Regions:
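Alpha-helix-loop-beta-strand connector modules within alpha/beta enzyme cores
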Residues: 1-4, 23-47, 76-102, 135-140
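Catalytic cores of alpha/beta
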Residues: 2, 6-17, 47-61, 90-97, ...
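A short, well-structured catalytic beta-strand-centered motif of the EAL phosphodiesterase domain
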Residues: 20
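Glycine-rich phosphate-binding active-site loops on the catalytic face of alpha/beta enzymes
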Residues: 23-31, 61-76, 110-138
Length: 140
């Protein structure tokens, strides 16, 4: 999948598959209207069920929760394991774990998470390929 974060206008211009919105459900309906039914429109929903449910009801193809570990980003709250477990049990929309992931968190979330979004965990590592391999191995 090729997607861009927030920049809806770039999706069609560059032939991308979709967009990853960072404001939960707030701009989801407009993105769906502008990009059409075939585009992948996902939403980052922070750490709350409410935000995720709102995005799913607005037509998100997936929701992402995070951060999943200690990070300087955000307000210090973390997406808890039980959020992912509840979501995977109750909601059909795929769920992504995002932000501050390490092999232990990945292993703990693997059974209840559809996908993982790795970023700084890989790109900030001294050996990005080795870091990615450790994270992928933790999925099981």
């Amino acid at each position: 999948m090729q997607a861009v974060q927030r920049h809806i206008l770039l999706v069609a211009r560059h032939g991308l598959d979709g967009v990853h919105l960072t404001d939960g459900a707030r701009s989801l309906r407009a993105a769906r209207r502008d990009l059409g039914a075939d585009a992948i429109v996902g939403a980052f929903c922070g750490t709350t069920r409410h935000e995720g449910i709102s995005a799913a009801e607005a037509g998100a193809d997936y929701v992402a929760f995070g951060p999943c570990g200690e990070t300087a980003l955000g307000d210090g709250r973390q997406a808890a394991d039980d959020l992912f477990a509840w979501w995977s049990e109750m909601i059909e929309v795929p769920v992504i774990a995002e932000g501050a992931l390490d092999p232990a968190r990945v292993a703990a979330l693997a059974a209840s998470t559809d996908f993982f979004a790795f970023g700084a965990e890989v790109w900030s590592a001294p050996d990005p390929l080795a870091a990615l391999r450790r994270l992928v191995a933790a999925i099981g």
